[in-house]
Amino acid sequence: MSSITAVVPVRKGSQRVPNKNTKSFAGSSLLEIKIESLKSLGDLLDDIVVSSDCADMLAIAKDLGVKTHVRDSYFASSEVNNSQFFRNLAESISGDNLMYSPVTCPLISKETYSKCIDSFRRIGKPVATVREIKHHMWQSGKPLNYSIENSPNSQDLPDIVYLTYGVCLISREDMIRNSNVVTLESTFIKLNELESIDIDTPLDFEVAEYLYKSKNT
């Protein structure tokens, strides 16, 4: 059976939430919580690798017994776009298949991880988590998903999802070939509102911490 390596990317710089990866979060940190969550999956994973340009974060990973990858500072900077970052990450980490696992999604359950891995094993196609949205959306002065002359109730809007990036499971070869963690063949696993939370702002951090504490008390 081909191997699955969970990859946890973290970097020094955080433009909106300073030191968010190691900042105190529910008595721990986002990095530590993610590592422990992945370790709890046991034999479902073959390896866990933390990729970072930060010595302190790499030290945390080593203390928790997982592998590390020293990321080039250029690929940890805002100078590279997502595609460049994804391709470099896949080229730098060994393993048949990679499970992209950012620390900014701390509320993903063990059941969801298992569901994603099971789907990947059974169907053999990339897997990515998504969140369904039902909003009247506009771009460049025009509605995107409805007609202004016949505005539907929100529940009747077309099914549109956005990538949460909470779990993205893909073969290493596909990740390099597509320079991405998703492809046109990806199977989408829908998350609920709680699990789809992604920390990008100070408010996100506070809300996620409150919900994490509520869920784990």
Regions found by a protein language model. Give the residues of each.
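Short phosphate-binding loop-to-helix
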Residues: 55-99, 107-115
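Structural beta-sheet core signal
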Residues: 6-8, 50, 100, 126-128, ...
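Alpha-helix/helix-capping structural signal
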Residues: 55, 173-174, 203
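Hydrophobic helical membrane-anchoring modules
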Residues: 195-217
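Conserved core of the sugar-phosphate nucleotidyltransferase
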Residues: 82-85, 106-195
